[in-house]
Amino acid sequence: MEKEKFYSRFTEKKSAKADAQNKRKEFNKQRDKYFDDKRRGLDKKEVNFSDKKNIPLDAKILSSANMFNYDKMPADALKVLESFDSIVQSIRPMNSRQMQKLPKDIRALSHQLTDERETRNVSYMNATEQLSAYIRYFTWWNLVRLTRVFANLPSDSFNLKDDSVVIDIGSGPLTVVTALWLARPELRNKKLIVYCMDISQSTMAVGEEIYMSVAAKAVASDANAEGFWKIIRVKGEIGTEIKRRANLITCANMFNELYQKDHDAPEKIADKQIRNLFNYASEDCSFFIAEPGMPVAGRFISLMRERFLQKGLKVASPCPHQKDCPMNGLHARYGGSEKWCNFSFSTENAPSKLLKLSESAGLPKERAVISFIMAQPGKIADKKNLREKDSLSVAIVSDPIYLAGHRQGFYSCSENGMVLVVNAYGKKIKSGDVLEFTMLRPYSSLQKDKKSGAPEITI
């Protein structure tokens, strides 16, 4: 056997590093090309709705609401989000040299969270540079997403009272807790006990400082209120014992990381995690789960939704029905073609400094994407055949797609399954819209989309 040359260990390391760098460059190139092509494609395929005359309609819109309505955001929450970088700087200051390097650190961490996630250390946020990059960029964007979702959830989504218990699993820098405080002012007056669980004690400690600073700026309306919730930090991962039973359990951007170390089938992972969640839950517990808008996460959300329904809970949002998920992302982890549930909203109202930081890091965002579910105790609608019903609720899931004949469509979710909503007359429709229709023709007579097989509803 040939003896290893003394320098081989160094050249191999250098080669591995070079391969990683080349992989990263290629990823950047392909991603930038994708978004450039998409933007150019959208520009080319603008539909001239003035040319659409006398197109027969399948349905008439009775009502419309959007699950990311910017106008539902509290004014003080918007001010905090706009100045979030200043809040972080007061708690975890960076010098000019570190600030100059921040965009590069953000981009490097972005790779660890995406194309390099398989080799990422699970305790990545214990590193100083990575924690700073995460809080100053990813936490900021997550707050933008989560506050928009929380502010638009139904008014009865958080039936919490004084001394109610909240358990936030995978807390990181307490992003969910901070977002909930900002987006739901009625909860600021409550004496809540919030257990925050994460494997990184230092990350939670920084997050608690951020939360307390935010609570001092976005104050409770009741002058006699405590002014903040009681935070109890628990070091550990899901399954770690907590003696109190929860009235609300939240998890954001946590379950997708399980795929890094759990190679069971998604169904088995969901079975395991639903048991873990219910081990913490009281009888009246509600659940909120949010994950990144990517196929594997969308598939997992759909599996958890199925299990919540089996447990007798109702889905308060985002689904317009309690039936089987028609966009369940089956085989998503293997690149399957099935549609998967994720929503997006425009970043035009995002904090200006955050948008600028995104540009500096080479990660421009025109859309914020999220997959989520809110499940709570309540009566489930009877599972009867509603296919000929005069009214139909649909949730617009996709961004606009361009169909043959210069038409514009949106893949959407309904109690009858996936449908393709065809926008014939230039109505303002976007992902996250929940539309109530009156059907003008029998559902069974609708034309089918050739690509997906979904019934087309022209409005």
PLM ranges: what are they?
Residues 349-459:
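C-terminal lobe and adjacent flexible extensions of AdoMet/dcAdoMet transferase-like proteins
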Residues 173-189:
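Conserved SAM-binding loop of SAM-dependent methyltransferases across substrates and taxa
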Residues 4-17, 23-120:
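N-terminal auxiliary segments of SAM/dcSAM-dependent transferases
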Residues 206-243:
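S-adenosyl-L-methionine
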Residues 247-267:
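A short SAM/SAH-binding and catalytic strip from SAM-dependent methyltransferases
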Residues 120-156:
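Class I SAM-dependent methyltransferase Rossmann-like catalytic core
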